[in-house]
A protein has these predicted regions:
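Extracytoplasmic/periplasmic mature domains of Sec-exported, cell-envelope-associated bacterial proteins
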Residues: 1-290
Length: 290
C-alpha cells in the first residue's frame, strides 16, 4: 500500500516482463496491513504466480526475493527464512529525495521497533505492526510489493520493509540482511476482501497494551463489550502467548492479533496478578481496516 502512497501525482503504471506496460487502477488498499490491489487496464493472457502456504514455512528454509531494487528490474536475490512471526512496525516508503540518511532505521516502508535503532527521516504515513517473515535475502528500496518465493516458485510473502543503517553522509545504505515480508496467507485474505468490496476488515481484541517485564504484553485497559471483555480479560492481565506463538512485548501481541482472521477463535495464555499462567479462549471481533 505504501507504494501507491508514494506514486508521483497518483499516476500508476504496471510494467511486465516482456517490456510492455499498461495503466493500472486502484481496487482498494489496507494501509494498516500494507496491502493494496490494483487492476491493469486492457491486459489479458497473463500467467499468475502460484501461491504458497506461509503457515508451513520453516526457519532456515531457502527463499528468493524478486523485485526492482534501486530501479534494477528483474533482480533476484537468495537467502533463507531467518525468523517467523517477527513483530515489525512499518511506515510508508520515502521518496528518493527523502532517502537520505542519517543512521537509523529506514526501509521499503521505514521500519521501527528494533532496539538501538531510530527512525530515519521520511514523509509521515500511517504505521502498522506486521507479523512478518524475516529473511536475509538482499532487499533494498524498490523491492516493495515484490514476491518472496520458495524453491518451488510459489509466493510465500510480499516484501514490505527492511532495516538499514544510514550512511551518515548522504544516501541510504543498502541491505544488511534484515528484510521483512508480509505472509502470503494474510495478504491473500485481505486481497480477496479488497477485490470483493474495495474494503478490508481486521481482527479486534479491544484492549490497549504496554510492554511487560520480563516479557509479555500487559493489558492497560479493556474496552467494555468487545472481544477481550467478553472473554473475561481484565486490565493488568499479562498475555504471554497467542496460540503457540510467544508474545515478548506489546508489539508482539498487536502483530499476532493483526495477522489473525476477523471473527476467528484464538487461545491466549494469560497471567493474572501472582497467579499461574492459564489459557483463555477468545473470539476476535471484526472492524473495518484503515
Amino acid at each position: 500500500a505504501h507504494v501507491l502512497a508514494a506514486a508521483q501525482g497518483g499516476q500508476l503504471t504496471a510494467t511486465f516482463q516482456n517490456g510492455s506496460s499498461a495503466p493500472v487502477q486502484e481496487v482498494g488498499q489496507d494501509t494498516q496491513a500494507d496491502i493494496a490491489v490494483v487492476r491493469a487496464q486492457g491486459v489479458s493472457g497473463l500467467t499468475p504466480i502460484q501461491l504458497g502456504n506461509s503457515d508451513t514455512l520453516q526457519v532456515g528454509q531457502p527463499v528468493v526475493a524478486v523485485g526492482t531494487p534501486l530501479g534494477l528490474a528483474g533482480t533476484v536475490t537468495s537467502g533463507i527464512v531467518s525468523a517467523l512471526n517477527r513483530p515489525v512496525e512499518t511506515q510508508g516508503e520515502p521518496s528518493p529525495s527523502q532517502q537520505q540518511g542519517q543512521g537509523g532505521l529506514s526501509g521499503l516502508g521505514g521500519l521501527g521497533g528494533l532496539s538501538g535503532l531510530s527512525a530515519a527521516p521520511q514523509q509521515q504515513t500511517p504505521t502498522s505492526v506486521l507479523d512478518a517473515i524475516q529473511t536475509d535475502a538482499a532487499i533494498n528500496p524498490g523491492n516493495s510489493g515484490g514476491p518472496l518465493v520458495d524453491m518451488q516458485g510459489r509466493i510465500v510473502g510480499l516484501n514490505s520493509a527492511i532495516a538499514s543503517l544510514g550512511s551518515g553522509g548522504g544516501g541510504q545504505s543498502g541491505s544488511i540482511g534484515l528484510g521483512f515480508s508480509i505472509p502470503i496467507n494474510q495478504a491473500k485474505r485481505i486481497a480477496d476482501e479488497l477485490i470483493a468490496s474495495g474494503h478490508a476488515t481486521q481482527a479486534q481484541l479491544g484492549v490497549s497494551v504496554r510492554d511487560s517485564q520480563p516479557n509479555g504484553a500487559q493489558l492497560v485497559s479493556v474496552a467494555p463489550g468487545l472481544a477481550a471483555a467478553k472473554a473475561g480479560l481484565q486490565a493488568g492481565d499479562v498475555v504471554t502467548k497467542v496460540g503457540s506463538q510467544l508474545v515478548e512485548n506489546s508489539d508482539g501481541l498487536v502483530a499476532a492479533i493483526n495477522s489473525a482472521d476477523p471473527g476467528s477463535n484464538v487461545t491466549l495464555t494469560v497471567t493474572s496478578g501472582a497467579g499461574a499462567p492459564h489459557t483463555v479462549p477468545v473470539t476476535l471481533g471484526s472492524v473495518p481496516a484503515s
